[in-house]
């Protein structure tokens, strides 16, 4: 047995399913998950010492690459001052100012410890502010594992064939309306039924938990207009896209202004950090300024703030996002070219530092139902072929891929050469 196989069997005795987040268990592709011992730059190294070119990046945060020197050194220095205080710090203020500078739609921001906390709190704030109960989300979009958001969700829930989870009371779930992503008519139909009951729309501006689905032209703008018309708040969930699609996130890339934004992943530099923020009049409804309660023992943790600030500072370098987008385009279009060469149907999507590939005869993938019809046997074969070649992709057909600034010509060329060999064997 490999060391990963031994560790997985050991883990299953004490951890449900052997993992602490379901998609890591490889249920979507079969086989044994790789247990990782270390990471550096564009590479991760498993418990057996094998190196992989990594396109998961801890599910998005590692935009500069693993173990980046500036983040590592900042964290090591900060540790000497203590790990957690449970009291306000100057670092929180500096972080808030930095986030607001980079995301102009925010007047104020609240730090939390995860993306789930961010979306859960933003939903509560929207309900409290509007005094309405219903929320509208989109089929296949994932906003963390809060009860109201695990209805027809994406990510691991979709991978496991459980887009809705047991344990969510029907009386609670009935307040969650689920529309079709990239379909404004489906959204309008809910506002026709509940014109004064919908507190907010929440959306992944690039759906990264049903693979990678960018918005069609006019879709985000249409949602903004509907929220304005019916008095609902527009929440853009940038936990995945924030500081990855552009310096100001997907909202900056597409030119759409939300009422509230949720953040996670990149903002923490690899540490557990989330945030939500928006217009001052809405944020002032949050305790202790207002009546909507939200709190967290480790919110604004000084080590996490240090890591996040080091990463955000580095992301302000000129030309960084243009370079990252060019690398991402090269990988996605390289996969497509190799698939075409070997007669294997494939469609691709990419935006900023995110990409997706789909084994399908359809040319353009814009909806959840198209993703569910893709050839999963081809995906599993490609996944394990690439893993054997030393390329680590997301172990699910419903997750986006991520590049980092550490991926250079060598890594990209080796990845595309591996894809060519694997696809040749799949013919």
Curated annotation (Swiss-Prot):
Pathway(s) annotated for this protein in UniProt: Porphyrin-containing compound metabolism; protoporphyrin-IX biosynthesis; 5-aminolevulinate from L-glutamyl-tRNA(Glu): step 2/2
Transmembrane segments: none
Coiled-coil ranges per UniProt: none
EC number(s) recorded for this UniProt protein: 5.4.3.8
GO terms, molecular function: glutamate-1-semialdehyde 2,1-aminomutase activity; pyridoxal phosphate binding; transaminase activity
Annotated PROSITE patterns: AA_TRANSFER_CLASS_3
Cofactor(s) required for function per UniProt: pyridoxal 5'-phosphate
Positions of post-translational N6-(pyridoxal phosphate)lysine modification: 265
UniProt keywords, alphabetically: Cytoplasm, Isomerase, Porphyrin biosynthesis, Pyridoxal phosphate
Biological process per Gene Ontology, one example term: protoporphyrinogen IX biosynthetic process
Catalytic activity: (S)-4-amino-5-oxopentanoate = 5-aminolevulinate
Compartment annotation: Cytoplasm
Assigned GO CC terms: cytoplasm
Known partners and oligomeric status: Homodimer.
Family to which the UniProt record says this protein belongs: Belongs to the class-III pyridoxal-phosphate-dependent aminotransferase family. HemL subfamily.
NCBIfam families named in the record: hemL, PRK00062.1
Protein name (Swiss-Prot/TrEMBL): Glutamate-1-semialdehyde 2,1-aminomutase
Originating species: Shewanella amazonensis (strain ATCC BAA-1098 / SB2B)
């Amino acid at each position: 047995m490999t060391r990963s196989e031994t560790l997985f069997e050991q883990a299953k005795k004490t951890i449900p399913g052997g993992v602490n987040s379901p998609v890591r268990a490889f249920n979507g592709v079969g086989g044994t998950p790789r247990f990782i011992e270390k990471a550096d730059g564009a590479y991760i190294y498993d418990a057996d010492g094998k190196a992989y070119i990594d396109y998961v990046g801890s599910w998005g945060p590692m935009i500069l690459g693993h173990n980046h020197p500036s983040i590592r050194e900042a964290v090591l220095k900060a540790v000497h001052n203590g790990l957690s205080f449970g009291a306000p710090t100057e670092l929180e203020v500096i972080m808030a100012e930095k986030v607001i500078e980079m995301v102009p739609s925010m007047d104020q921001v609240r730090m939390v410890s995860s993306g789930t906390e961010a979306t859960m709190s933003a939903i509560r704030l929207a309900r409290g502010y509007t005094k309405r109960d219903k929320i509208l989300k989109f089929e296949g979009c994932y906003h963390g594992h809060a009860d109201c958001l695990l209805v027809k969700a994406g990510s691991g829930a979709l991978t496991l064939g459980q887009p809705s989870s047991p344990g969510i009371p029907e009386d609670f779930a009935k307040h969650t309306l689920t529309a079709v992503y990239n379909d404004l008519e489906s959204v309008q139909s809910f506002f026709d039924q509940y014109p004064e009951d919908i507190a907010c729309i929440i959306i992944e501006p690039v759906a990264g938990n049903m693979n990678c689905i960018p918005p069609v032209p006019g879709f985000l703008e249409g949602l903004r207009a509907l929220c304005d018309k019916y008095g609902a708040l527009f929440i853009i969930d940038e936990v995945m896209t924030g500081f990855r699609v552009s310096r100001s996130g997907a909202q900056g890339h597409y030119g759409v202004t939300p009422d509230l934004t949720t953040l996670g992943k990149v903002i923490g530099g690899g540490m557990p950090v989330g945030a939500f923020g928006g217009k001052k009049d809405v944020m002032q409804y949050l305790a202790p300024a207002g009546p909507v309660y939200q709190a967290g023992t480790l919110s604004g943790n000084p080590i996490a703030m240090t890591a996040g600030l080091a990463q955000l500072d580095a992301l302000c370098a000129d030309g960084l996002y243009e370079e990252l987008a060019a690398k991402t385009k090269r990988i996605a279009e390289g996969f497509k070219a190799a698939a075409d060469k070997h007669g294997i149907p494939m469609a691709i999507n990419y935006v900023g530092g995110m990409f997706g590939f789909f084994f399908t005869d359809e040319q353009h993938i814009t909806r959840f139902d198209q993703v569910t019809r893709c050839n999963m046997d081809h995906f599993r074969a490609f996944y394990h072929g690439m893993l054997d070649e030393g390329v680590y992709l997301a172990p699910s057909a419903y997750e986006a891929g991520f590049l980092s600034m550490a991926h250079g010509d060598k890594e990209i060329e080796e990845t595309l050469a591996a894809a060519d060999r694997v696809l040749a064997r799949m013919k």
